[in-house]
């Protein structure tokens, strides 16, 4: 067997130097067995070393948790993906959201909701008014434009359908049912000593700042040990209770394709094996920033056996990447306290997965 430590070391050490990353943690899983590789520090001042229990902001990887919560509502018969968005929020009734489905919101196809809320609307008080005044650029279901306000609203409405606030449902129901004990939206006082300091492009300390639907779109903080457990239950959900098995199946369903990528709920999927360039391309800035015509899969299709499932996530001071291949039982998680380019995360993960799949 390949010496995984050697592969991870030789991949991560030059990467951290080139990208000036203070701290980074890698978790891999193979045949149900997790291994951890930790590098550098969680905080440049205190020099606290990174461990597999260090908490990182995972940015948009949070979208996969939001999708799982929505899948849980779906499994419990509280919503249908075909329902109009306005059904769950009276303030949006009688207008465009009567013609935009929950699935459109969950897959970034509502009609051009932007990547971020505009600054003046980026708070809970202004949020509803933002959606009421938003003018679609495209017909619903025609174009994919990756968007926090889109999947954020999806999560918010899913929580409405379950009759509880999103944060409460996530922290008290969904995360415990997934077996995640060190995954938080709000990091409790008792865990703050584990919360890494993030560093921006200039190396200045930074933490995620509050915004509209932040919990739903980019609010999770977790460790590589919890995240690799999450990967394992995504690959082998049979140990979970039935509604969560169904929830995970919904997130791994392909709803449409854009070029080589199949869009799930939260997760993005590719045929495996995949060349590194194709995976880099699917996680490119262009893919995140520009609209792309979608080809709907009717009916939606369960992921084929050999599929790589992945998601990137970033905040001002953190960079995350998760990738796994359920048919092989292989997964990798890479968390860092710096927002460095997605291409570098993907290349590192691809090298590690390829070495494990020898």
From Swiss-Prot:
GO cellular component, one term: outer membrane-bounded periplasmic space
EC number: 3.5.2.6
Subcellular location: Periplasm
Coarse class of the protein's main subcellular location: periplasm
Catalytic residues in the record: 60 (acyl-ester intermediate), 146 (proton acceptor)
InterPro entries: Bact_CellWall_Synth/Modif, Beta-lactam-related, Beta-lactam/transpept-like, Beta-lactam_class-C_AS
A GO MF term: beta-lactamase activity
Record's catalysed reaction(s): a beta-lactam + H2O = a substituted beta-amino acid
Keyword field: Antibiotic resistance, Hydrolase, Periplasm
Hydrolase in keyword set: yes
Residues reported to bind substrate: 311-313
Keyword Hydrolase: yes
SUPFAM superfamilies (UniProt xref): beta-lactamase/transpeptidase-like (SSF56601)
One Gene Ontology term from the biological process aspect of the record: antibiotic catabolic process
Cited function: This protein is a serine beta-lactamase with a substrate specificity for cephalosporins.
Other noteworthy facts: The class C beta-lactamase family has a specific amino-acid numbering system known as SANC, for structural alignment-based numbering of class C beta-lactamases, or else the simpler name structural position. A multiple sequence alignment was used to derive a consensus sequence and then the consensus was numbered taking into account insertions and deletions. This allows use of identical numbers, e.g. for active site residues, despite differences in protein length.
Similarity comment: family membership: Belongs to the class-C beta-lactamase family.
This protein's name: Beta-lactamase
Name of the encoding gene: ampC
């Amino acid at each position: 067997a390949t010496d995984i430590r050697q592969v991870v070391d030789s991949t991560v050490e030059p990467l951290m130097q080139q990208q000036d990353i203070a701290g980074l943690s890698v978790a891999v899983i193979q045949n149900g067995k997790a291994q951890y590789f930790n590098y550098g520090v969680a905080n440049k001042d205190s020099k606290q070393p990174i461990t597999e229990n260090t908490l990182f902001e995972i940015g948009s990887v949070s979208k996969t948790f939001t999708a799982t919560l929505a899948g849980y509502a779906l499994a419990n018969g509280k919503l249908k993906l075909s329902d109009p968005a306005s059904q769950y929020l009276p303030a949006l009734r009688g207008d465009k959201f009567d013609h935009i489905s929950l699935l459109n919101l969950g897959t970034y196809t509502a009609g051009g909701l932007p990547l971020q809320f505009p600054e003046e609307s980026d708070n809970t008080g202004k949020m509803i008014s933002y959606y009421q005044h938003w003018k679609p650029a495209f017909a619903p279901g025609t174009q994919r434009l990756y968007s926090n306000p889109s999947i954020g609203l999806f999560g918010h409405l899913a929580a409405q359908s379950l009759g509880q606030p999103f944060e409460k449902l996530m922290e008290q129901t969904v995360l415990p049912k997934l077996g995640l004990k060190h995954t938080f939206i709000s990091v409790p006082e008792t865990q703050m000593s584990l919360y890494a300091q993030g560093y921006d492009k200039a190396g200045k300390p930074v933490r995620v700042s509050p915004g509209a639907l932040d919990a739903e779109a980019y609010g999770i903080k977790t460790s590589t040990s919890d995240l690799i457990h999450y990967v394992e239950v995504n690959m082998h959900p049979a140990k979970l209770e039935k509604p969560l098995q169904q929830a995970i199946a919904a997130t791994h369903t392909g709803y449409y394709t854009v070029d080589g990528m199949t869009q799930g709920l939260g997760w993005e999927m590719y045929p495996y094996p995949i060349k590194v360039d194709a995976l880099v391309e699917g996680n490119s800035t262009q893919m995140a920033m520009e609209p792309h015509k979608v080809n709907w899969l009717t009916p939606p299709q369960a992921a084929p056996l050999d599929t790589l499932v992945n998601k990137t996530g970033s905040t001002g001071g953190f960079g995350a990447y998760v990738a796994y291949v359920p048919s092989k039982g292989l997964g990798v998680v890479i968390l860092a306290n710096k927002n460095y380019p997605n291409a570098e995360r993907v290349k590192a993960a691809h090298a590690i997965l390829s070495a494990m799949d020898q």
